[in-house]
A protein has these predicted regions:
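Core of compact, soluble alpha-helical bundle domains
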Residues: 1-150
Length: 150
């Protein structure tokens, strides 16, 4: 145990969202997801317009983001809401396609017990981004596809 760990009370340590989730699985999730995004007629133009062929840095950032979300590493320091608000023109169908594709990859990468935890985090994030980009404070996010990835 490091000196820093000794100073943190056990009940205050941040635990992973699920004990079976590993950094390797998160890397695989991000790699597979964005590999399929690049083949998706709806999602690829949205991402490519911002990434402009520089997928390496984007994938590294997304891996850090998902490690922060699922493993509680705290390494991601970005601000995803303003980034997504600047995109403009996102439609409900874009979010539905994103969640549907994400669910498919989660089903391939994670253990069955971990899948609902990962999907719930993704849906919570998608709802937050949708609310920020919709501009409608009283609106409800679209219904996410429920029959995929679980």
């Amino acid at each position: 145990m490091s000196e820093r760990e000794l100073r943190v009370a056990p009940h205050l340590r941040r635990l992973p969202a699920h004990p079976s989730i590993t950094p390797g699985q998160i890397s695989e999730l991000v790699e597979r997801f964005f590999g399929r995004v690049r083949d998706d007629h709806r999602l690829d133009p949205i991402f490519e317009a911002r990434v402009r062929g520089e997928w390496g840095p984007h994938l590294a950032k997304m891996k850090g983001f998902w490690r922060s979300v699922l493993l509680k590493t705290g390494e991601y320091k970005g601000r995803p809401v303003p980034v997504h608000v600047r995109i403009g023109g996102l439609e409900n169908e874009d979010y539905i396609a994103w969640i549907g594709l994400f669910r498919d990859i989660v089903a391939e990468v994670f253990e069955p017990d971990a899948r609902p935890v990962v999907i719930e985090a993704a849906e919570r994030i998608a709802a937050s981004l949708w609310l920020a980009t919709s501009g409608e404070l009283t609106a409800k996010p679209p219904a996410w596809p429920q029959d995929r990835g679980r």
